[in-house]
Amino acid sequence: MKNLMDFCLGTVSFMILGSSLLLGSSDWALGGFIGKPSWDLFLHFENYDWSSFVFNLVFCATAATIVSGAMAERTKFSAYCVYSAIISLLIYPIEAHWIWNPGGWLVKLGFHDFAGSCAIHMVGGISALIGAALLGPRIGKFNKDENGKVVKVHTFPGHNLPLGALGVFILWFGWYGFNGAAATSVEQLGSIFLTTTIAPALATVSCMIFTWLKYGKPDVSMCLNASLAGLVAITAPCDTVDAFGAAIIGIVAGLLVVFGVWLCDHALHVDDPVGAVAVHGVNGIWGTIAVGLFSTTTVPGNDTLNGLFYGGGIHPLLIQLLGFAAVAAWTAVTITIVFLIIKKTMGLRVSEEEEIKGLDPTEHGLPTAYADFLTTK
């Protein structure tokens, strides 16, 4: 239901204001900071860029839906609807305007994010981290001593690992469209497909080897997240890196996802049930930075951008770092304000009784989401 509303409420928000803030002219005010609000979708439909609206809407909804996993099992549905709509209305469109609108200030500086490691995944990951931190952990996640120090972290296994694996396979397949949709030639599309295959594959292998060595067994759920981490990391540089660059990006992503999960659980004590922060936040940052390291003009369609390791100097890396910092700051400030307002007014979290009983009956009036487990007398 939450993922459904991400897209449906996101469509409403993007239609009302978000699309014009992203796609509108930058010349009207603030020098590339925000697009000019307009109702061209309704007033000048015959001349509107319909395909661009749909293309950017899907990206917008993706940023919003990342947050749900980190706040699972204890968030009010009403609160979820509010912040999801605001992400699509204001938070995502403005920073995406900086990155993808020809008049955006980051575009003018030379910042590069082909398909959204920064604009989509990092934004979703940062929002997820802040939301989960303000919401608090699920009941029983952390054991604390008399001084309030966390002494034990409990793992709650997912209810259906094969279904989760199927989701990863579907996402991986869909990512070829996600990354390849903006290709301008067949050669560039082929190169993007190749890097989009190499990075998640190497990420999964590196994660498997690492968890095998560390825990004595390869961690299935961590490897599934590593596949997604590799996809997230390659999303920004998929059109500017070669096979070697994609391989290194993937290997690092597979290790970073393990580190990100550890960071949330044992250092920050933030309860992220699905690893959204590690997958999207940490590897969104890594993918953004990787553009400034591994880009090469030997790749079809990339005639100008060389990274630090390919003779381009430090300037491209500094631009990527600036862009990451600006978008991260914008996202952190705005989503924190949104969450705090919701928390002080309608409330973010369900009651302890509702959480223990489960959100299916308390939020949606369902005995359970899994009818096969119902028994009749």
Predicted regions and their residues:
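Glycine- and aromatic-enriched membrane alpha-helices
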Residues: 1-377
